[in-house]
Amino acid sequence: PDWRIEMRIKGEDIAAAYREIRGLSRKVEDPEYIRICFSQKASPGGYYWIFPKGENLVNVGLGVQMKEGFPNPKNMLYRSVLSKPSFLDSKVLEGGGGLVSTRRPMSNMVGNGILFVGDAAYQPNPVHGGGIGPSMVAGKLAAQAACRGIEDGDLSMESLWSYNVEFMKWYGAKAAGLDIFRIFLQKCSDDELNYGMANGLIKEEDLLKASLGEDLKLTVTEKARRFFRGLGRPSFLRALEKTAKNMKKMKSLYMRYPQPREFEVWLRQVNDIVREMEEMTF
């Protein structure tokens, strides 16, 4: 049946990841901080992380974008991260890998008598892949929609649609904006990211705010200051400004998530923004 549900996900929207829990031979440096590193060389299209879990214990892992010919994430972790001096004589306590969606949520998560939640609905955070929180709330919202449908004797797509609306306003809008930022980051080379950070085009607070789902707000004064710093690579600055605008557009679209009769028009607008980002060059 035509339930307007996306049944396939592109490889570019999936991360293949591998992580280990490791006991270190020395104390963790700055245990109150987590480390996330975006590097096309070390983790193509993804990032690697080091999360302290105790004085001598860390969760260390790496994810790569599942484009054609993508490298083995375990091999990349050992080559790019575990070869560092801080992991000398460390021991593996636990290890494992898997696949994580790294895109905005499924555009429609309901059909006649069915609701999609969690990984099945592409609900993990598009930037870092964490999905426990969003999935738990989605489960509650889906259950509430199902209960209302059972009480009314109507489990049609239209009856369950409230789950879409509530989830998209609560989290989908944030994730949609993050998806735009994720596409931008995956297009950046290591040199471009380093250049942007060194010259203030991408600042630490920009990355933090964006990873938390906030807009990249550029005031007129800030725009002017960044413009002059970006004279060396004006196309990179234009791409950053386009990304900020499209993040805001996507969040606005998802906050105005439609009823079924307006869904096709809304979806075309979403896909147009995503296509613009995917075709962007700099």
Question: Positions of the model-derived regions?
Answer:
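C-terminal helical "tail/cap" subdomain of flavin- and related membrane-associated enzymes
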Residues: 147-282
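A general structural signal for short secondary-structure boundary/capping elements
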Residues: 31-41, 64-67, 82-86, 94-102, ...
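Short, Lys/Arg-enriched charge-dense amphipathic segments
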Residues: 28-37, 73-77, 109-122, 174-188, ...
